[in-house]
Design a protein with these regions (language model features):
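Positively charged n-region of N-terminal signal peptides that target proteins for export
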Residues: 1-4
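Bacterial N-terminal signal peptides
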Residues: 7-17
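A residue-level marker of the well-folded mature domains of exported/periplasmic proteins
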Residues: 22-332
Length: 332
């Protein structure tokens, strides 16, 4: 009898778990560049794949290839009962604002922008803090006293990366020149590796020996240009050190993988909450990468200095200005 009861309980637990999995229908709308952009979108995908492998729960997905699809795909996911729905990137904000109002019972999360609605969770990062750290690395590594920055689309968010980077560089050596260029003013700026390579080469030819790219797929061109010209680059969002081993000084890590994973996990266990989440150094939401692909480029002194700066920023001893607080950077 006890064995029968145990078997029934196990069967009931299995059926309950199965029904819960069936009822839980997470989804994601990737931004332009797609889930294999080796940068921002791919970081999101890595986090969601971790969730899928751990739980066995599949998720629906769409990729934006043109502006009109944002609203269309978000609405399609919500109308099919997907919940929670992740909108990837700041470009989804306008469409999400509209669609989230149409589906007030659906939980939405947007990564990299704020949408202030009762059924939306907004996750943003202190990119300026992580960029400060790689700026410190660049200044310590540079032999030419000149470094560069290539941004993607010319928007305040990317100036936030640039400003943090310049502050980090100047913190070590105020005399270092920082060349800065944005790729363009339309979403196409995120996926133009040839232009990224061209901008980086111009900086290398002008004397820069390290260029930081915060430009999505365009940044791959910067990394390639560094390798082609025997210079160094700095990657962004995901760990890009392996893409050009020995030529990527480091990558400014933006832990969108962790953020995406937590959206699905909290959605499943009931702890998901609307509102705002801001992830910086203290929350381990940003950082820098050190692995077998760049370990020979980073000296012990550099590691010690960056670690001390990281602690000082968290403690409030070093203040890193957020460009988006006033659309200005105190240093150039």
């Amino acid at each position: 009898m006890k064995r029968m009861l145990s078997a029934l309980l196990l069967a009931g637990l299995f059926l309950w778990s199965a029904s819960q999995a069936l009822a839980f229908k997470p989804a994601v709308l990737f931004d332009m560049g797609g889930k294999f952009d080796k940068s921002f979108n791919e970081g999101i995908w890595n986090g969601l794949e971790k969730f899928r492998k751990e739980t066995g729960i599949k998720y629906r997905e769409f990729e934006v290839t043109q502006e009109a699809q944002r609203e269309q795909f978000l609405r399609k996911l919500a109308s099919r009962g997907s919940d929670p729905v992740i909108a990837v990137g700041f470009g989804q904000a306008a469409a999400l604002t509209k669609v989230a109002k149409e589906f007030p019972k659906t939980r939405f999360s947007i990564i990299d922008m704020v949408v202030d609605l009762p059924n939306v969770q907004s996750i943003i990062f202190k990119e300026h803090e992580g960029s400060f750290l790689v700026g410190v690395l660049a200044a310590m590594k540079s032999d030419s006293a000149a470094v560069g920055f290539v941004g993607g689309m010319d928007i305040p968010l990317i100036h936030k990366f640039a400003c943090g980077y310049v502050q980090g560089v100047k913190h070590i050596n105020p005399g270092v020149v920082v060349y800065q260029k944005m790729t363009g003013t339309t979403p196409a700026a995120w996926n133009d590796p040839a232009r990224g390579a061209q901008l980086a080469k111009t900086m290398y030819d002008s004397g820069a020996d390290i260029v930081y790219a915060a430009a999505g797929g365009t940044g791959l061109g910067v990394l390639q240009a560094a390798a082609d010209n025997n210079k160094l680059s700095i990657g962004v969002d995901s760990n890009q050190n392996h893409l050009q081993p020995g030529f990527v000084l480091s990558s400014m890590l933006k832990r969108v993988d962790v953020a995406a994973y937590e959206v699905f996990k909290s959605g499943q266990d009931g702890s998901w909450k609307a509102g705002f989440k801001i992830l910086g150094l203290a929350e381990e939401g940003v950082g820098w990468s050190l692995d077998e692909h760049n370990s020979k480029l980073v000296t012990s002194a550099m590691k010690r200095k960056v670690e001390q700066v990281r602690k000082d920023i968290i403690a409030g001893n070093i203040k890193v200005h957020d460009y988006m607080s006033n659309n200005k950077c105190p240093v150039q």
